[in-house]
Design a protein with these regions (language model features):
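ATP-dependent helicase/translocase motor core
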Residues: 1-235, 244-254
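Conserved SAM-binding loop
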Residues: 238
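Conserved H-loop
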Residues: 241
Length: 254
């Protein structure tokens, strides 16, 4: 259910978020829009409006999955603990190709992120909470901050393809179920060298390549979270080449 101008009153503060997306009566997504024709409007103003809602009508965000902000030109999504710089665009509607710059970012986000299948998948498998400790050097007081993190579009599509490929390689998917599936397409269609067909049960899941700073550790967490459900709680072995990566990955998984 999508509601326009949904009114929320809390502590005598009536507020009307532009769009609220409900799933089974639960407000999971809040969308704040600004008018592209207004020269004073910006996507940052939409973010600030969300911050105002969080302060004045916090109960609206009790079960919130994520929020979307847009000024009509740009459109980005983030969690309720994300700073403005952590809000990210959803750049593909199908995970195959990046959307054309001629297509509205909001349209791409709605088609790629807010369709029923992707939305529920994001809620269930691609949102995590990370706790960080910070000690005051003067008082010695330790504060623990909890940050809610959500997969970016490249992590979402990469992890789901990795899961599909792993299930195929392990023989968990029957050949007839692969008919028309993207895991059976040739890597050559992406300009990569590869075989024409990936047989079921060949024990070759493949390689996921990420650039530096693109969230490799979280992608591993998302992948592990999905694969343990699909494959009857398998053992996952993580191999690193540096001690600092051991600590980093341990903290991320923990």
């Amino acid at each position: 259910l999508v509601v326009n101008q949904f009114t929320v009153v809390e502590n005598n503060h009536p507020k009307r978020p532009d769009i609220v997306l409900f799933v089974n009566g639960i407000p999971l997504v809040v969308i704040e829009l600004k008018n592209a024709a207004d020269e004073n409007a910006s996507i940052r103003m939409a973010f600030k409006q969300i911050e105002t809602y969080k302060a004045l009508i916090p109960t609206l965000f009790t079960y919130n999955g994520f929020v979307v902000i847009s000024d009509g030109l740009e459109a980005k999504a983030g969690t309720i603990s994300s700073g403005f710089s952590r809000f990210m665009a959803w750049k593909s509607s199908d995970g195959q190709v990046e959307a054309s710059h001629l297509v509205s970012q909001l349209e791409t986000l709605i088609e790629g992120m807010l369709n029923k299948e992707t939305l529920i998948d994001l809620m269930r498998h691609f949102i995590v909470f990370e706790k960080t400790k910070k000690e005051d050097p003067e008082t010695g007081i330790i504060t623990i901050n909890t940050v809610k993190k959500m997969a970016a579009y490249h992590q979402y599509y990469a992890v789901n393809r990795a899961v599909e490929s792993t299930l195929r390689a392990a023989g968990y998917i029957l050949p007839e179920l692969l008919e028309g599936s993207y895991v059976n397409e040739s890597p050559e269609s992406y300009g990569l060298a590869g075989v024409k067909k990936q047989p079921v049960g060949d024990r070759k899941g493949g390689v996921v390549w990420h650039t530096q700073g693109s969230g490799k550790s979280l992608s591993m967490v998302f992948f592990t979270g999905k694969i343990v459900l699909e494959m009857d709680n398998p053992t996952v072995v993580v191999i690193t080449d540096r001690n600092d990566l051991d600590d980093q990955l341990f903290d991320t998984f923990a």
